[in-house]
Amino acid sequence: MSEKIVQLNEEIIKGQLKELVRGSVEETLNELLEKEAESLTQAARYERSEARQGYRSGHYDRNLTTTSGDVTLHVPRLKGMSFETAIIERYRRRESSVEEALIEMYLAGVSVRRVEDITEALWGSKVSPATISELNKKAYVHIEDWRNRPLQGGRYPYVYVDGIYLRRNWCGEYENVAVLVAIAVNEDGFREVLGAAEGMKEDKASWVSFFQWLRGRGLDGVKLIVGDKCMGMLEAVCEVFPDAKYQRCTVHFYRNVFSVVPKSKVKIVVKMLKAIHAQESKKASREKAKAVVAELRAMKLKEAAKKVEDGIEETLTYCDFPSEHWTRIRTNNVIERLNREIRRRTRVVGTFPDGNSALMLVCARLRHVADTQWGNKKYMNMKHLEAALDDASIAG
């Protein structure tokens, strides 16, 4: 009698084992998150205790890439205290840096040897350069999913926007096209990249489309939008977020004034302008601005005086918000630093073959910086804003 031979499908077994490990990792990490929350609050969920510190306020989901695969973390929300977990810091998402490397290889035209070396470092085995195109398609899908993800950070009181120009091929001709970028500080005080999208130029139509896209994905609770006074942006803010206030970036405002000031007088004008925004109230800043305008006219800098006189009010909106936040909401330096990092990477490419490749590289960099540099570092203490929301000047 012949014995039956059982054939095992190695790929199926590997897949099942991988899913078993992934599920175990996911379950363990979520249990650790709950333990961390219990330790911080000094009480279990639903437990009544005199020693309790803070209160539970549900959960929010966050995807995390581990060596065992993608897992979904159910991160506890706490009221009355911040929850800064070491779990996410330790197992921070690695996907973005991998995708960025793939896209850079594809766009920068790296050598075959470098492609082999990098792919071996990333996946443990050398990948033929012939497969790079397929790998990039996969990376594009992941980044596009991230770019269009629902915004789940609750409310976003402070939003920073800017445009970065990249050179790309457009119907056989090369021209500069704007990539519009937005980041925000959420209600818990953490920075978050909201998104990036290509706009033919920084005009009202592009900004309206961009803001509507963000709002459609869940951007809510906006109190202040910080940015440069580029064409059409202020009108777009009023149309899409009528209850939000607009803060013109003071750094961009200064540069605009410097454009009509002789180089020999820039240093003294810098001190004059900074003195306006060093005041302790909007009223004092307005009075200082009037004095600066008069002084500029006395220095025969009539154009500079007019720019200050016409534009100063838009730069003082930050005074309507908690003074503890002033230094971080009167400029969009937080997004400018991101843009410098993006330019450093895109400079290697030079001219992009199309808008999609440019946008994907920008998004990959944004995601990488947010994941690796921002992490769980709180950017602002939002209790100051919560305490001020009863003020009609902020509530709008």
Regions found by a protein language model. Give the residues of each.
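Short, conserved DNA-binding cores of transcription-related domains
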Residues: 2-89, 167
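Short, amphipathic alpha-helical "recognition" segments used to contact nucleic acids or chromatin
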Residues: 97-109
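Conserved beta-strand -> loop -> alpha-helix junction used to position metal-binding or nucleic-acid-contacting
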Residues: 224-231, 236-272
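DNA-recognition alpha helix
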Residues: 113-124
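RNase H-like nuclease fold core
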Residues: 74-79, 86-92, 125-126, 131-226, ...
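Metal-dependent DNA phosphodiester-chemistry modules and their immediately adjacent helices/loops
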Residues: 84, 257-291
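Acidic/histidine-rich catalytic cores and adjacent linkers
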Residues: 2-4, 24, 35-38, 42-43, ...
